[in-house]
């Protein structure tokens, strides 16, 4: 019985720790969609809107609309990696599909035969 109680308390502590851990949030831009005639909820700021809607400019001043989320492009370019000349299919699984899935400054780049999180090559600007 003591083992079950200890296990339950351990699981509760783990759940609490995971809930407090900072989550990775990729940088994004929020854009307002084109206004439609069916939108009637007027607003002055995002605080006037419900749920995930935001206050967007409209002919009436402002209306609550569901925003368009656009990923912010990351700096740099992917390093060049020569693909191996293999006669068989690649059996590696990709780690990512686009840059928004990568932490920090890393980019989602082709490496050998799958997509990987890689450090970008930053272009130097001529002075």
From Swiss-Prot:
Its main location: secreted. One of its GO terms (cellular component) is extracellular region. This is Whey acidic protein. SUPFAM superfamilies: Elafin-like. The gene is WAP. It is found in: Secreted. One of its GO terms (molecular function) is peptidase inhibitor activity. Residues 26-68, 71-121 form the WAP domain. Could be a protease inhibitor. Pfam families: WAP. Keywords: Disulfide bond, Milk protein, Protease inhibitor, Repeat, Secreted, Signal. It comes from Oryctolagus cuniculus (Rabbit). Milk-specific; major protein component of milk whey. The lineage of its organism: Eukaryota, Metazoa, Chordata, Craniata, Vertebrata. CDD domains: WAP (cd00199). InterPro entries: Elafin-like_sf (IPR036645), WAP_dom (IPR008197).
């Amino acid at each position: 019985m003591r083992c079950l109680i200890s296990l339950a308390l351990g699981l509760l502590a783990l759940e609490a720790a995971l809930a407090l851990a900072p989550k990775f949030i990729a940088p994004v831009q929020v854009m307002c969609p084109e206004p439609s005639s069916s939108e009637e909820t007027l607003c002055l700021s995002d605080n006037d809107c419900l749920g995930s809607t935001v206050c967007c400019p409209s002919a009436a001043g402002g209306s609550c609309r569901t925003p368009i989320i656009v990923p912010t492009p990351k700096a740099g370019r992917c390093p060049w990696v020569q693909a191996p000349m293999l006669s068989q299919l690649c059996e590696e699984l990709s780690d990512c599909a686009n840059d928004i899935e990568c932490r920090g400054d890393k980019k989602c780049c082709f490496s050998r035969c799958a997509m990987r999180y890689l450090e970008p090559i930053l272009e130097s600007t001529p002075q």
